[in-house]
């Protein structure tokens, strides 16, 4: 496996002064308050998910200092079933936008601007290639949000209404987010590169009152007029009961002419309804009231609409930001993301702590591979968020960020979106970034708007996996070979044994519901149908018995299981990437058709430009996998592929390919960036015929 028990992985980083961190100080506060003797991260984690976990949540509530009114008797009923979606901090009322735009004062209901003063820069907008850089102060932000919220209210937007954006990661998008949530409404965002069907698959389910839409988009050096897409969206949303129209936001200094579009106004025209009212007003709502709709990847159908609560996300985000990450007014956060991904929340939530958010829009590779890196240096970014795919591109092209620009301000770099391979951990420290930077491999996602595995300042960073769990959020590894079903109890495995990631205890940032008439059943089926009274997340993981790292080995539904030997596809990708530079990418799936007695592993290779696939290469790949892992890991068949299906967020999509080669017909999801790529794989459902005839079709 990726983390052998007999030896420790290579240590790459540790905090130079752990006693200076918020997490260490929090431990001392809890020790004094509850008569404890905690001294390590594991001590804190075990206490936070133990029998006294309500003590932990009480202490955390005092620590995070959210602006709120009302009071609670206990954080949660510890005996409530997890699938009942227990109510947290009942009696507390608060507002998302208020906590972003202000900081709590001396009393729980009061607010101050001490770390968000009028003249302090709140966010910086940077467009593709480091161009069009513009700073916005907290005063700018508060005034624009107030004007927009008052215009929305004048147009009838109220608590519980949905307002959507199809837009870039920009100042205007942020203002829409904060304006609708200031009124107690729900925010939903999609990126402009999504297809019309993908956007409608989302919006038709939630029936928004308004959709705020960029009028132009710029990506990868290409400028796109979005008005044809706006027209299609208007037509698609016309039957909805609550939908009033589209508001266009200017991508450039001028507005595109939208006079020919029905029910469409520009942002400036929309703001007239505010009548120049710059006073901020906040609707404080119940802790578990909804404020955000996000979406599952929808790789096998229409995406599920996951609804998160105001209090749950604020509590979880402050826990992660303040204690795990030491965020504060000195922080400069840049999360590379589109608005269509849950990581857009990460781009914004650092502002809770008074941080400056750098809102980057565009490709990180334009006009060249160093442009985005230069932005990190120029903006003196302290906390960077990127993906393994981005790091892989830098490594592949021999680009070393620390040789490109001054990264002395950078303290932490998070990576998420897919498994971070061991080779990239070592490249990060040996070649890529300064050794003082904490590489924070994190995993969690859309379902919880937070993390199951993440960094902390008290334990070292070793090669592979995540440093550890998120405090207060219990995780366990269950035996994946158990069939599961209603009422079936799972079996927890020892550390060092791979299995299925579960959360056995409720947490405040559980979604409050799924939108739609059949939302309750979809919610149950998504998380609770497999094992009784635990959240099953769908990841195949292992916890190192000594370091307690969490190794994410792949998706549980993509686990490979030839002859009863279970392993994750990430292990195969690791070997291919490390030893075969002529291969650009790969996808590995299990094939088990209705009449097959066992699963067969198929590996498809996408060749790099200028390189050709050969049977000798296939044999070399098989041999190296057997050498590096075991003979049982070796794919039975290795083929070339012209294209690998990915989502619009560039996540490799294994499940549809697995279903197709196993003899099923799959309807491509609207979230796939390249849905036609699936057609190629249908021929492998009759693999014996292909091998007999030697007639694999090499093109789509």
Task: Give the predicted meaning of each segment.
Residues 165, 191-216, 377, 384, ...:
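AMP-binding/adenylate-forming catalytic core of the ANL superfamily
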Residues 132, 151-194, 198-200, 334-338:
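Conserved AMP-binding/adenylate-forming
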């Amino acid at each position: 496996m990726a983390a052998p028990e007999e030896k420790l992985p290579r240590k790459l980083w540790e905090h130079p002064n752990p006693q200076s961190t918020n997490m260490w100080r929090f431990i001392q506060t809890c020790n004094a308050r509850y008569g404890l003797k905690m001294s390590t991260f594991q001590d804190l984690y075990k206490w936070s998910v133990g029998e006294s976990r309500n003590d932990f949540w009480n202490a955390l509530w005092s620590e995070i200092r959210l602006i709120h009114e009302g009071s609670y008797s206990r954080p949660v009923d510890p005996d409530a079933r997890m699938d009942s979606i227990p109510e947290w901090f009942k009696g507390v009322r608060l507002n998302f936008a208020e906590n972003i735009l202000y900081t709590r004062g001396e009393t729980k209901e009061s607010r101050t601007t001490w770390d968000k003063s009028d003249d302090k820069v709140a966010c910086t907008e940077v467009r593709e290639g480091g161009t069009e850089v513009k700073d916005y102060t907290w005063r700018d932000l508060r005034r624009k949000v107030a004007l927009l919220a008052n215009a929305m209210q004048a147009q009838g937007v109220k608590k519980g209404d949905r307002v959507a954006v199809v837009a870039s990661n920009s100042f205007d998008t942020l203002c829409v987010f904060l304006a609708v949530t200031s009124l107690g409404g729900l925010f939903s965002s999609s990126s402009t590169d999504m297809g019309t069907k993908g956007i409608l698959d989302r919006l038709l389910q939630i029936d928004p009152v308004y959709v705020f839409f960029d009028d132009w988009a710029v990506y990868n050096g290409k400028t796109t007029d979005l008005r044809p897409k706006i027209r299609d969206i208007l037509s698609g949303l016309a039957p909805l009961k609550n939908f009033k129209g589209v508001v266009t936001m200017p991508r450039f200094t001028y507005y595109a002419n939208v006079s020919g579009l029905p029910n469409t106004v520009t942002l400036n025209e929309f703001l007239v309804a505010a009548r120049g009212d710059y006073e901020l007003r906040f609707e404080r709502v119940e802790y578990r009231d909804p404020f955000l709709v996000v979406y599952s990847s929808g790789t096998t159908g229409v995406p599920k609409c996951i609804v998160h609560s105001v209090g749950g996300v604020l509590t979880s985000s402050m826990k992660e930001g303040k204690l795990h990450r030491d965020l504060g007014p000195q922080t400069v956060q840049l999360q590379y993301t589109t608005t269509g991904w849950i990581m857009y929340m990460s781009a914004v939530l650092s502002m809770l702590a008074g941080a400056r958010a750098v809102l980057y829009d565009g490709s990180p590779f334009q006009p060249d591979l160093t442009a985005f890196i230069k932005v990190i240096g120029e903006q003196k970014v302290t906390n960077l968020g990127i993906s393994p795919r981005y790091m892989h591109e830098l490594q592949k092209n021999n680009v070393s960020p620390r040789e490109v620009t001054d990264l002395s301000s950078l303290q932490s770099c998070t990576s998420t979106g897919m498994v971070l391979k061991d080779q990239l951990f070592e490249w990060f420290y040996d070649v890529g970034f300064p050794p003082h930077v904490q590489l924070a491999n994190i995993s969690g996602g859309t379902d919880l708007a937070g993390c199951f595995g993440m960094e902390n300042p008290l334990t070292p960073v070793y090669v592979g996996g995540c440093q550890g769990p998120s405090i207060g959020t219990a995780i366990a590894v269950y035996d994946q070979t158990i069939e599961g079903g209603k009422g079936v109890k799972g079996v927890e495995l020892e550390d060092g044994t791979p299995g299925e990631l579960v959360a056995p205890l409720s947490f405040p940032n559980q979604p409050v519901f799924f939108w739609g008439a059949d939302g309750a059943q979809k919610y149950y089926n998504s998380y609770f149908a497999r094992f009784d009274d635990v959240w099953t997340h769908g990841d195949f993981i292992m916890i190192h018995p000594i370091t307690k790292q969490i190794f994410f080995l792949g998706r549980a539904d993509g686990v490979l299981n030839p002859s009863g030997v279970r392993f994750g596809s990430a292990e195969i990708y690791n070997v291919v990437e490390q030893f075969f530079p002529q291969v650009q990418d790969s996808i590995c799936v299990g094939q088990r058709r209705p009449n097959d007695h066992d699963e067969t592993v198929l590996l498809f290779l996408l060749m790099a430009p200028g390189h050709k696939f050969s049977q000798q290469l296939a044999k070399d790949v098989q041999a190296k996998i057997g050498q590096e892992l075991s003979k049982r890991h070796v794919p039975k068949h290795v083929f070339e592929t012209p294209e690998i299906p990915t989502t619009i967020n560039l996540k490799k999509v294994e499940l549809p390919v697995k279903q197709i080669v196993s003899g099923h017909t799959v309807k491509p999801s609207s979230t796939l960036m390249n849905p036609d790529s699936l057609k190629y794989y249908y021929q492998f459902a009759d693999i014996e015929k292909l091998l007999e005839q030697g007639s694999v079709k090499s093109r789509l």
